[in-house]
Regions:
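Membrane-interface junctions at transmembrane-helix termini in multi-pass inner-membrane proteins
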Residues: 137-159, 376-406
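N-terminal membrane topogenesis motif
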Residues: 1-27, 83, 87, 225-252, ...
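Membrane-interface helix-loop junctions in multi-pass transport and translocation proteins
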Residues: 154, 165-203, 208, 398, ...
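Helix-loop junctions and terminal segments of transmembrane helices
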Residues: 63-78, 296-319, 326
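Interfacial/gating helices of multi-pass transporter permease domains
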Residues: 36-56, 183, 187-188, 236-241, ...
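Interfacial segments at transmembrane-helix termini and the short loops linking adjacent helices
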Residues: 112-129, 345-378
């Protein structure tokens, strides 16, 4: 078992971003669940058709740069070169502002052609409404990368919360207001919430930057190291890191963009109408995929903290610290991801019924089946995110790109084949997604162990969390069946989730998966640790 220092900035950063992520996901649930109940699977189909293309453009213009900025800033600061660290940020901010302007203008003038190319003209309003976000998100990304490189995760956390809050308020308000004008227009109102949130998130992090600017510039003035880190060198270093990451990050939204057209067309090829195919796609992306994305709040937070932490240790050539961080990151990812997999699988239909109860029984049953298949993708998706961050921090960004590309190719092939089989239909897209992430995660893990020269403690990192999660799933299944007979309905689902969470924590302690050192990291952890140790519950 890897012991973690209380002063470990990686853990602290991950905790801050996880808390922010939980708040963001709660707000997201407040947004997506009533949204799906308002515009139904038809509207979610339009919304989700536009969204992957928007994410693709944002990925191209921003995804690799926050990581590149964080890595370079962290490395320069580790060497005491604050002047170069600040120069990296200023050059990146200029480039991202230009990139955001170009991508927003591209969508503004090409929106109609884009939606026609994927044979869904009703998604036009949903796409155009996201144009302002395409400009502001890259700017926000530059500031977030800079603060993350300084190992200050608070500005990112606050801007995330502000961004999501306004997205919810504006998105739901416009959806209600525009509903009388038709589902396509209402879906466009929902999309505009993303633009409103991006503007507020940018404003928040810019204000925080202004508050820190004096101390940042003081650091620069006090820097004794004199280096000629030119603009050309900065651009070269940024692109060297960012381009492979951007290519890798673009694979998933590209995959989703292809899905938007491929899935609907393949469903039509076996007799589904365009409307029904769109509704099934809405169930996949708007209902099931939304729930699959919830555990990512933790893996994304872990990943964002891993890059600067590993880059810092790598710059100091501290191999032991690198191995400790990697082991901790994988273990944390599995501890969170595994119970989500089995919980979503066991309670797939009850959870869909709990959240999307205003939809028809047919929609709830169909979405539940999709979620059951898709649930197994949670652990592989969260692992891919964490392992990708580790390889990026080690200066090997191309490895996860190649592995994810292999997975994406498998997904496209399997989606094409499986979705056109009548007995499988839309579930084929879910199965292919799981296979894609499983392939990428396994390849990442194998190559990471070689790059970092690390031998994993499989019993503590993999086996113990798996046993605890399986035990939890069995308890949840029997609890739900028992409660359903007594109280029925959605309350039994809520209580079963609570019982499952409690059972998982107990099983983690009983199996020795959670140690006394781990307990110390939670509030009042030392007192709790002594209490549990008194009853011989900690190992």
């Amino acid at each position: 078992v890897i012991l973690l220092s209380k002063n470990n900035s990686f853990i602290k950063g991950a905790a801050i971003l996880s808390i922010a992520g939980i708040i963001v996901k709660i707000l997201g649930a407040i947004y997506r669940i009533p949204l799906a109940n308002i515009i139904k699977d038809e509207g979610m189909g339009y919304y989700q058709t536009a969204y992957p293309f928007y994410v693709l453009l944002l990925t191209i213009s921003t995804s690799g740069f926050p990581v590149a900025i964080a890595k370079l800033v962290s490395e320069k600061r580790a060497l005491g070169d604050h002047r170069s660290a600040y120069r990296v940020f200023k050059v990146a901010l200029t480039g991202l502002t230009i990139g955001g302007l170009l991508s927003s203008l591209f969508v503004l003038f090409m929106a109609e052609d884009i939606v026609r190319s994927i044979d869904n003209i009703n998604a036009y309003y949903s796409l155009v409404a996201l144009v302002p976000a395409l400009f502001f998100v890259p700017i926000m990304a530059a500031f977030r990368g800079f603060f993350q490189g300084r190992k200050n995760m608070v500005p990112t956390a606050l801007s995330q919360i502000g961004e999501q809050f306004l997205r919810v308020v504006v998105g739901l308000s416009l959806t209600y207001y525009l509903l009388d004008r038709g589902i396509p227009v209402a879906a466009g109102g929902a999309s505009f919430g993303g633009s409103a949130g991006a503007i507020l998130g940018t404003v928040i992090i810019f204000i925080i930057f202004l508050l820190h600017k004096e101390s940042i510039e003081r650091e620069v003035r006090q820097t004794r190291i004199q280096t000629d880190y030119s603009v050309g060198e900065i651009i070269k270093d940024l692109l060297t890191i960012a381009v492979p990451i951007t290519i890798g990050a673009a694979i998933i939204p590209t995959m989703d963009t292809i899905d938007a057209g491929l899935v609907i067309r393949r469903l039509q090829s076996i007799g589904y109408s365009k409307e029904t195919a769109n509704e099934l796609y809405g169930q996949l992306k708007g209902f099931a995929q939304t729930l699959i994305n919830l555990p990512q709040v933790f893996s994304v937070a872990i990943g964002m903290s891993l890059v600067p932490a590993i880059a810092d240790a790598n710059a100091r050539r501290n191999k032991r610290e690198i191995r400790q961080i990697i082991g901790s990151g994988i273990r944390m990812t599995l501890l969170i991801g595994l119970p989500c997999v089995f919980g979503l699988f066991v309670l797939a239909k009850p959870i869909i019924n709990l959240l999307y109860f205003k939809n028809t029984i047919e929609t709830i049953n169909s979405s539940g089946e999709i979620l059951a298949y898709l649930s197994f993708g949670v652990i592989f998706l969260t692992l891919v995110q964490a392992l990708t961050a580790m390889l990026q921090g080690l200066g090997k960004p191309l490895i996860p790109v190649i592995n994810l590309f292999i997975g994406a190719l498998l997904k496209i092939i399997l989606t094409y084949i499986l979705t056109a089989i009548p007995g499988i239909n839309i579930k084929g897209a879910a199965i292919s997604t799981v296979v894609a992430y499983a392939t990428a995660a396994i390849l990442d893990l194998i190559l990471l162990s070689k790059v970092a020269k690390i031998k994993f403690n499989y019993r503590d990192i993999f086996i113990k969390p798996l046993i605890s999660a399986l035990g939890m799933a069995i308890i949840v299944r029997f609890s739900y069946g028992f409660l359903l007979k007594i109280i029925g309905g959605r309350l039994s689902t809520i209580l079963s989730i609570g019982i499952g969470g409690l059972a998982y924590v107990i099983l983690l302690i009983v199996t020795g998966t959670i140690t006394e050192e781990d307990i110390k990291f939670i509030p009042k952890g030392e007192r709790l640790g002594r209490y549990l140790d008194k009853f011989k519950l900690l190992k």
